Amino acid sequence: LGVNNFASIVTNTSNKAVLIDGKKLKSVNQYYNKKKAKVQSQLKKTNGKANSRRLMNLTRKRNNKVKDYLHKASKEIVGMCLEDNITTLIVGHNDGWKQEVNMSKRNNQNFVSIPFDMFISMLRYKSERQGLRFVEVNESHTSKCSSFDLESVEYHDTYVGKRIKRGLFRTKDGILLNADVNGSYNIMRKVKGDAVMPPYTGFGYNPVKKFINKYTLK
């Protein structure tokens, strides 16, 4: 789970990698944060009830947009599982998410504004309702370890692969794949082991992008 790529999805039943676009949701949060700061600044100057109501309405509208996006994204993912005859849905979870990482203020703001725990709860409910097994696993070390090199998913002083520019991950043998796809395979390996890894055919370099409608807060 992330911001620009809201969810990265891989399976052990097909050579298919899917990224659910998160930029529309990100833009909703950016617009909300910008307008919220403006209204709060006006409130400090005037203490007016009208501005207070504006802030409440803005927040309600933003929350409704976010919740609607999460519902549609979770429905899309569970639908993909059923379509591909997946019986277990594995989701990576970071206890502190990514706020503890040294990121820009804007990125931190985006992470704080996206209720990933709510999204995971929606996924759990919808998947179990369809008879799927739902597993939540800590995603620590999954972004640094090389999935296609079958590197053990744990801390290493030196890693065999490396994340490089433009969100790409390079394996020990120089194979390039999307960094989020690499992390997703490692999340799956934490639960299912190395046997789930498919032969690499280049699909991880250019995964399929899915969009959850067009969102705007304006």
Q: What does each model-found stretch correspond to?
A:
Residues 2-120, 197-218:
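Substrate-contacting helices/loops that form the catalytic groove of nucleic-acid
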Residues 108-218:
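Positively charged, low-complexity nucleic-acid-binding target-recognition regions
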